[in-house]
């Protein structure tokens, strides 16, 4: 279990997060939603071990987070892929750093590429891929090291609406099949409501958790209900509008 308790943080000398607490249990997909500048990415960077909090505690399975680790796989908004490597060697990169044999890391990388729907693209270079395909490579690379926790920082924000929905479906399929703890950062309200088993809404910076919602739309998709049927369901629309109202309420507080 990931446990974040009483987290305070600064970014470039300014307060970014204020007394943030959350937990992610095994098999839970938690989405953090908030406007630009609310500290969402700072929160992810702290959990990933890329930054150190001003105060508070972060533990994964009761072990303090003190730096980056293969226990926490990260998928970045800009993918962070290596353009001089082909697809399969990008997926192998973390395994190579971990000292896995060439043969075993190739087997693992090919398995992950098949999982994300990129079988047959192993020897393409990154510049030959669409935005959605590059994000699939990023997800495959993160999954290859078999992390306990998967962290995604607005991974679908730059994609067109059709591709974004495909990637949301892929993520839910991976969540269903692996049972991993997942934390996703987004500013897209519909995406947040669709994916989250628990949704945390952050206030404008410095970010505080102002709303927590338990949702089941992602679980419904994982159990076989079509995405379009879920998103056109009056219950889904009502939840989406409720969250939208909360977001605008926070903006009005600032004004």
UniProtKB/Swiss-Prot annotation:
It comes from Yersinia pseudotuberculosis serotype I (strain IP32953). Residues 2-229 form the ABC transporter domain. This is Taurine import ATP-binding protein TauB. It is an enzyme of class 7 (translocase). Pfam families: ABC_tran. One of its GO terms (molecular function) is ABC-type taurine transporter transporter activity. NCBIfam families: PRK11248.1. GO terms for cellular component: plasma membrane. It catalyses: taurine(out) + ATP + H2O = taurine(in) + ADP + phosphate + H(+). SUPFAM superfamilies: P-loop containing nucleoside triphosphate hydrolases. Its EC number is 7.6.2.7.
